[in-house]
């Protein structure tokens, strides 16, 4: 059975655990509409992505 040669220091343990935290999703302000949206994603309200019309926007009832 594999046994560690040295005790893992609290610093090394913390560095390893730093990747386990849940990170909040990032949002950017859309240049055209001013709404918040995810980067590299289509704006669902306008249907635009990188200056091009990709989707037809849904009609609000």
Swiss-Prot record:
> What Pfam families does the entry give?
Ribosomal_L32p
Q: Which GO terms describe its cellular component?
A: large ribosomal subunit
Molecular function, one GO term: structural constituent of ribosome
Keywords annotated in UniProt: Ribonucleoprotein, Ribosomal protein
Asked if the keyword Ribonucleoprotein belongs to this entry, the reply reads: yes
Tell me the protein's name: Large ribosomal subunit protein bL32
Q: Record keywords: Ribonucleoprotein included? A: yes
Task: Identify its protein family.
Answer: Belongs to the bacterial ribosomal protein bL32 family.
Annotated region (Disordered), positions in chain: 1-40
Output the GO biological process annotations, alphabetical, semicolon-separated. translation
InterPro entries documented for this protein: Ribosomal_bL32 (IPR002677), Ribosomal_bL32_bact (IPR044957), Ribosomal_zn-bd (IPR011332)
Which residue windows are transmembrane per the record?
Answer: none
Locate the compositionally biased regions of type Basic and acidic residues: 28-40
- Please list the residue ranges that the record marks as compositionally biased, kind Basic residues: 1-16
| Gene designation | rpmF
Q: Which organism is it from?
A: Sinorhizobium medicae (strain WSM419) (Ensifer medicae)
